[in-house]
Amino acid sequence: MEKVLVTGGAGYIGSHTVLELLEAGYSPVVIDNFHNAIRGEDSMPESLRRVQELTGRSVEFEEMDILDQAALQHLFKKHSFKAVIHFAGLKAVGESVQKPLDYYRVNLTGTIQLLEIMRAHGVKNLVFSSSATVYGNPQYLPLDEAHPTGGCTNPYGKSKFFIEEMIRDLCRADTAWNAVLLRYFNPIGAHASGRIGEDPQGIPNNLMPYVSQVAIGRREALNVFGDDYATEDGTGVRDYIHVVDLAKGHIAALKKLKEQCGCRTYNLGTGTGYSVLQMVQAMEKASGKKIPYKVVARREGDVAACYANPSLAHEELGWTAALGLDRMCEDLWRWQKQNPSGFGAQA
């Protein structure tokens, strides 16, 4: 069984990907520093404890920070990894504007150290979590992989763009490297069991966890940031993708690495954009609850509309998002209902 290192594997996308790795017969080794994960029994992240329960397989986990070089060295000596899936990093757009150095230190330095240690141990296969934020303000829609990158509107997006460039340069300099850069659009939803899902710490930065917390009664009302965008109903349009589809994209990416693919970049999205108000409606339908909202000022750095052309991933990875909006909302609602306080308190 192939050993794959998953950094940041206890988080939202990471934990769903670890589950898919197990289902696909890989042997994942997970590191995480609990920045975005809840500690369960035996110092195991609660998300991964539940992944073990769902799959009946055990997950090897070590608490570790990607900035801790000595610990990473030790890990790579102990295991012989075939590939690395790199999720670890800071990810809140708004916070990145306030704390740019934190974002550059963790995301850039952390990745550089990881790449150096991979190189030293001859592990030259990488899947990287990038983001549609690398496109900046869309010059045209839908966004394909040829759309210019780098006009990012915040340090989070810039950090993802810089890392993409770094990996690209590395693959150019040494053709033994293979990397797949996955540009995520907006992952939502949860595993169909309702046992794992997104559990933001504090006030959610993303729309759907906030909406579902309003539906369950944890929050009063949703703030809609601007209704004067040049979109059909004036609210921001995004490409929402089911987290399970997204996780499966990482399995397809690992297979691609085996073809000695060099550096490849793919959008992971559905190709369909939905507005904030359409998402509120869809969530009202799934939950049977009314979701009160109020319109407030636009948020700095937000673009009017952003959605993918996902056809390259379909052609080259054989991957397509299969789960639609209703399913995303139903699964999100099941998770929220079964875990009203997330992983922290057992429902």
Swiss-Prot record:
Its cofactor is NAD(+). One of its GO terms (biological process) is galactose catabolic process via UDP-galactose, Leloir pathway. Substrate binds at residues 131-133, 184-186, 205-207, 223-225, 238, 299-302. Pathway: Carbohydrate metabolism; galactose metabolism. Its EC number is 5.1.3.2, 5.1.3.7. It holds the Pfam family GDP_Man_Dehyd. It catalyses: UDP-alpha-D-glucose = UDP-alpha-D-galactose; UDP-N-acetyl-alpha-D-glucosamine = UDP-N-acetyl-alpha-D-galactosamine. One of its GO terms (molecular function) is UDP-N-acetylglucosamine 4-epimerase activity. The active site is at Y156. InterPro entries: NAD(P)-bd_dom, NAD(P)-bd_dom_sf, UDP_G4E. CDD domains: UDP_G4E_1_SDR_e. It is an enzyme of class 5 (isomerase). Keywords: Carbohydrate metabolism, Galactose metabolism, Isomerase, NAD. The keyword Isomerase applies. NAD(+) binds at G11, Y12, I13, D32, N33, F34, H35, N36, D65, I66, F87, K91, K160, Y184. Belongs to the NAD(P)-dependent epimerase/dehydratase family. Catalyzes two distinct but analogous reactions: the reversible epimerization of UDP-glucose to UDP-galactose and the reversible epimerization of UDP-N-acetylglucosamine to UDP-N-acetylgalactosamine. The reaction with UDP-Gal plays a critical role in the Leloir pathway of galactose catabolism in which galactose is converted to the glycolytic intermediate glucose 6-phosphate. It contributes to the catabolism of dietary galactose and enables the endogenous biosynthesis of both UDP-Gal and UDP-GalNAc when exogenous sources are limited. Homodimer. This is UDP-glucose 4-epimerase. It comes from Mus musculus.
